[in-house]
């Protein structure tokens, strides 16, 4: 049968990445409290394509994922990238896992349990030698505006904000470390289940710790800079303003 993909390209330009996108896959992620947890990832996977080839072999990406160990860690991602490179005879391979990570969280006053989900992403790239890995985690938090509190006779405006952390690590770290780091930086964490006693606690605690978006990004960056296992980070905080029809944001990026 004719192999059209291996025929010469009519436009001799190399393609940085070509592959399959938005493929859903069961995933097992390391969990600090329980050892591991099952979740579902949306996977993008691809390779570099030389200028001389017309196309890549899309089915081989799916075959590689079908044979892959579902545990997400450095060893298994390295193995997957090596397998993809071999199957596609490629110089460089790239994979991107997006998945929700769940943490059981007790309400601060009543202890009522609830699951909070966090959007996470792990990206791996392999060219020659050791693969490069990057972790992304998005953490919802609450902020209370210090200016609004200072100038108002009663109350202050508050809102949900998103702390987005991207980082490269020298060694294994728990996802919980960076989630807790983000929550410590804001006026308050957010919760799934709150009874009246909990709402009172969260409101009063948040108003006792007002934070600008600038305060949150600096507090998070300070902790990431001090983390011994982080070699590079970027942290962005987006405040979904409750009294404006726009968001506020702040970002810090640093190589260590």
Curated annotation (Swiss-Prot):
GO terms for molecular function: GTP cyclohydrolase I activity. Keywords: Hydrolase. Pfam families: GCHY-1 (PF02649). Coiled coil: none annotated. Pathway: Cofactor biosynthesis; 7,8-dihydroneopterin triphosphate biosynthesis; 7,8-dihydroneopterin triphosphate from GTP: step 1/1. This is GTP cyclohydrolase FolE2. The record marks 145 as: May be catalytically important. Converts GTP to 7,8-dihydroneopterin triphosphate. Its EC number is 3.5.4.16. The keyword Hydrolase applies. InterPro entries: GTP_cyclohydrolase_FolE2, GTP_cyclohydrolase_FolE2/MptA. It is an enzyme of class 3 (hydrolase). The keyword Hydrolase applies. It comes from Oleidesulfovibrio alaskensis (strain ATCC BAA-1058 / DSM 17464 / G20) (Desulfovibrio alaskensis). It comes from the Bacteria. It catalyses: GTP + H2O = 7,8-dihydroneopterin 3'-triphosphate + formate + H(+).
């Amino acid at each position: 049968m004719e192999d059209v993909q291996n025929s010469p390209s009519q436009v001799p330009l190399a393609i940085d990445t070509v592959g399959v996108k938005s493929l859903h896959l069961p995933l097992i992620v390391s969990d600090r409290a329980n050892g591991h947890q099952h979740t579902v990832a949306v996977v993008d996977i691809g390779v570099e394509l030389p200028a001389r080839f017309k196309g890549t072999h899309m089915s081989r990406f799916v075959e590689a994922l079908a044979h892959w160990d579902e545990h997400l860690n450095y060893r298994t991602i390295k193995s997957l990238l090596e397998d993809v490179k071999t199957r596609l005879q490629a110089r460089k391979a790239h994979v991107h896992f997006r998945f929700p990570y769940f943490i059981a969280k007790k309400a601060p006053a009543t202890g009522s349990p609830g699951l909070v989900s966090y959007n996470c992403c792990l990206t791996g790239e392999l060219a020659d030698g050791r693969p490069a890995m990057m972790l992304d985690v998005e953490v919802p938090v609450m902020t209370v505006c210090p200016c609004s509190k200072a100038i108002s006779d009663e109350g202050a405006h508050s809102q949900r904000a998103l702390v987005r952390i991207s980082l490269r690590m020298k060694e294994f770290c728990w996802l919980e470390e960076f989630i807790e780091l983000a929550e410590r930086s804001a006026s308050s964490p957010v919760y799934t289940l709150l009874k009246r006693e909990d709402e009172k606690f969260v409101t009063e605690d948040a108003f006792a710790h007002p934070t600008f978006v600038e305060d949150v990004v600096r507090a998070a960056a300070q902790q990431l800079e001090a983390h011994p296992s982080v070699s590079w980070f970027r942290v962005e905080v987006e405040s979904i303003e409750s009294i404006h029809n726009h968001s506020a944001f702040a970002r810090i990026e640093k190589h260590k």
